[in-house]
Curated annotation (Swiss-Prot):
This is Putative uncharacterized protein DDB_G0282065. Residues 94-103 have a biased composition (Basic and acidic residues). Glycans are attached at residue 27. The keyword Glycoprotein applies. Coiled coil: none annotated. It is found in: Secreted. One of its GO terms (cellular component) is extracellular region. It comes from the Eukaryota. Keywords: Glycoprotein, Secreted, Signal. It comes from Dictyostelium discoideum (Social amoeba). Residues 54-72 have a biased composition (Low complexity).
Amino acid sequence: MKNYNFILISLFIIFFIILNISSNNNNFTNAEEMTGINDIINRRYQEYMENRTPNEQQQQQQQQQNNNNPPQHIDPLVGNPCNHDQIMQGRISKLKEKLKKDQQNQQQN
């Protein structure tokens, strides 16, 4: 029984030594040839960040456009810019009419 344990342990040790040697023996000799997944991710992230941040000229152009044309809410159902003033006036007039009707109903009761 002791011999079997010794043989199993020695086989595991030999296996791990061979595994370690094979993993350390890579064909990559130059750092340029080593393109790991982290290098690819870092490169793509850097390209994304460079393309994401606008330069100063683009920011100035956007500010000028925003100053010339104030932002408008686009109605999702119609696709045209909303006129909030008319919408709010319509709501207020409906509320006033409803209040008048409620007051008249209360006076009648």
